[in-house]
Amino acid sequence: MPASVVKPLDQSAAIDALLRGVPLPPAGWQANGPSGSADVQDQYQLAASVYGGVTCSWIDEWLLAQHAGDAARVQRAAAALKSSRSWPGLVAMSRGGDYADVVWEFADVISGTRATTAAGGKLSAYRTRIGGTSVTVPTGVGDYRSALGCDMPASK
């Protein structure tokens, strides 16, 4: 098998390796591989699923913190997302595809270093639900859940 293949028995260790040096979202978050993770997975797709989960969870936390008016939580989430430019596995992914660039666009918008994402364009703000809370997604962030694959089913 090619070196890029991650066998089912190796997925947990591969996920742990991908998360080294990555600030994890608040309690209750759990790393999951892609849907069908009982099957052999490509390293890139496994990494996209893991980093997508982390990124989406941090964006959710940022939105919930903004809704609650909790400046410290807003800052923590923005800093965690900004740090994505130094996540070793995500940096390695950038050499094999565009997924890391999408993560970094959202991170840059949320951390204030960029006005809008390519995926988000100049869309108007909209409301969405995170858990049981209705929040406003600001102009410029766009449909992060679709762009990052947040709504894709994942298995443990």
Task: List the predicted regions and their residue ranges.
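Mature extracellular/secreted ectodomains of secretory-pathway proteins
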Residues: 32-122
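Extracellularly exposed regions in secreted/surface proteins, prominently low-complexity, repeat-rich
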Residues: 1-7, 94-156
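Extracytoplasmic low-complexity, Pro/Thr/Ser/Ala/Gly-rich segments
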Residues: 1-48, 150-156
